[in-house]
Amino acid sequence: MAKVLVLYYSMYGHIETMARAVAEGASKVDGAEVVVKRVPETMSPQLFEKAGGKTQTAPVATPQELANYDAIIFGTPTRFGNMSGQMRTFLDQTGGLWASGALYGKLASVFSSTGTGGGQEQTITSTWTTLAHHGMVIVPIGYAAQELFDVSQVRGGTPYGATTIAGGDGSRQPSQEELSIARYQGEYVAGLAVKLNG
């Protein structure tokens, strides 16, 4: 049984929705055990509420437990072309895992969201840098998801990983096409994890 973790940070719920779709896709793979968790919030409850943050029910992960999984699919909103501060803070606590090589050879993939589309690819590839330092095997999705060829509407999605465009005010929710790409990413990564570890 290959263990797959979908690990995310979501303030307004866009990445949470994408994470559910990623997990749904991963769960289609026989031999994959899929877990969804989120990183801890670093804002105070008062500031989080004032900023309009969405309460979420996924359990909170600890950095040390990452070593228990064969594949980790990370989800983060874009903050100036980088991962969110909450995800950065979480990954900055993985020094012990790095020192012991605990994540070496494990699969890693990334999905993201942006307000207007700017930075979606940069966020994924800049997150890869941290994962590469851990010796993780980075898994992009390429152009296998047919929705990536559809230019008839505004949508996220890159060969690097699934993305969604939330709109400048955050009112746009992930489209069916974006969720389909996210499901593909989950299924693809879980399938590889089973082949390598199942």
Curated annotation (Swiss-Prot):
GO molecular-function terms, A-Z: flavin adenine dinucleotide binding; FMN binding; NAD binding; NADH:ubiquinone reductase (non-electrogenic) activity; NADP binding; NADPH dehydrogenase (quinone) activity
Residues annotated for substrate binding in this entry: 98
A GO term from the CC aspect: membrane
Reaction(s) this enzyme catalyzes, per UniProt: a quinone + NADH + H(+) = a quinol + NAD(+); a quinone + NADPH + H(+) = a quinol + NADP(+)
Record SUPFAM superfamilies: Flavoproteins (SSF52218)
Domain (Flavodoxin-like): residue spans on this chain: 4-189
Chain segments annotated as transmembrane: none
Keywords: Flavoprotein, FMN, NAD, NADP, Nucleotide-binding, Oxidoreductase
EC numbers on record: 1.6.5.2
Residues binding FMN, per UniProt: 10-15, 78-80, 113-118, 133
Binding residue positions for NAD(+): 12
Details of cofactor binding: Binds 1 FMN per monomer.
Pfam families to which the protein is assigned, alphabetical: FMN_red
EC main group: oxidoreductase
Required cofactor(s): FMN
HAMAP family tied to this protein: NQOR
Protein family according to the UniProt entry: Belongs to the WrbA family.
Protein name per its UniProtKB record: NAD(P)H dehydrogenase (quinone)
Biological source species: Escherichia coli O157:H7
Lineage per the UniProt record: Bacteria, Pseudomonadati, Pseudomonadota, Gammaproteobacteria, Enterobacterales
